[in-house]
Amino acid sequence: MASNNTASIAQARKLVEQLKMEANIDRIKVSKAAADLMAYCEAHAKEDPLLTPVPASENPFREKKFFCAIL
C-alpha cells in the first residue's frame, strides 16, 4: 500500500509540473489565430498547387495517352 501512495504522489507531482508548464504558455484569441491563418493562406495561395493547378505539360503524374490495340 505504501508503494501505491508513493506512485500516487509521483503521479500528482508530474501532473502539477505539466499544469505549471501549460499555465506559462502564451495564448491568443481564436479569432486572431483564424485571421492570421487566413492571411497566411491568402499570401501563399499562388504557390499552392491545389489552388493553382500545375500545367499539364509540367505535371509528372498526368495520364499518359497510350493506346494499345491487340491485333
From Swiss-Prot:
Maturation-removed propeptide residues:
69-71
Q: Which domain of life is it from?
A: Eukaryota
Partners and quaternary state? Answer: G proteins are composed of 3 units, alpha, beta and gamma. In this context, interacts with GNB2. The heterodimer formed by GNB1 and GNG2 interacts with ARHGEF5. The heterodimer formed by GNB1 and GNG2 interacts with GRK2. Forms complexes with TAS2R14 and G-proteins; these complexes play a role in the perception of bitterness. Component of the TAS2R14-GNAI1 complex, consisting of TAS2R14, GNAI1, GNB1 and GNG2. Component of the TAS2R14-GNAT3 complex, consisting of TAS2R14, GNAT3, GNB1 and GNG2. Component of the TAS2R14-GNAS2 complex, consisting of TAS2R14, GNAS2, GNB1 and GNG2.
Q: In this chain, where does the modification Cysteine methyl ester occur? A: C68
Tell whether Cell membrane is among the UniProt keywords: yes
Lipid (S-geranylgeranyl cysteine) linked to which residue positions?
C68
Question: What GO molecular functions are on record for this protein?
Answer: G-protein beta-subunit binding
GO biological process per UniProt: adenylate cyclase-activating dopamine receptor signaling pathway; cellular response to catecholamine stimulus; cellular response to prostaglandin E stimulus; fibroblast proliferation; G protein-coupled receptor signaling pathway
Instruction: Identify its membrane topology class.
Output: Lipid-anchor
An example GO CC term for this entry is:
extracellular exosome
Chain positions with N-acetylalanine modification: A2
* Pfam families the record matches: G-gamma
Q: Where in the cell is it found?
A: Cell membrane
Which UniProt keywords are listed?
Acetylation, Cell membrane, Host-virus interaction, Lipoprotein, Membrane, Methylation, Prenylation, Transducer
Q: Is Cytoplasm set as a keyword in this record?
A: no
Q: What tissues express this gene product?
A: Expressed in fetal tissues, including testis, adrenal gland, brain, white blood cells and brain.
Query: What's this protein's name?
Result: Guanine nucleotide-binding protein G(I)/G(S)/G(O) subunit gamma-2
Q: Which SUPFAM superfamilies match?
A: Transducin (heterotrimeric G protein), gamma chain
Family designation: Belongs to the G protein gamma family.
Question: Gene3D superfamilies annotated for this entry?
Answer: Transducin (heterotrimeric G protein), gamma chain
What does this gene product do?
Guanine nucleotide-binding proteins (G proteins) are involved as a modulator or transducer in various transmembrane signaling systems. The beta and gamma chains are required for the GTPase activity, for replacement of GDP by GTP, and for G protein-effector interaction.
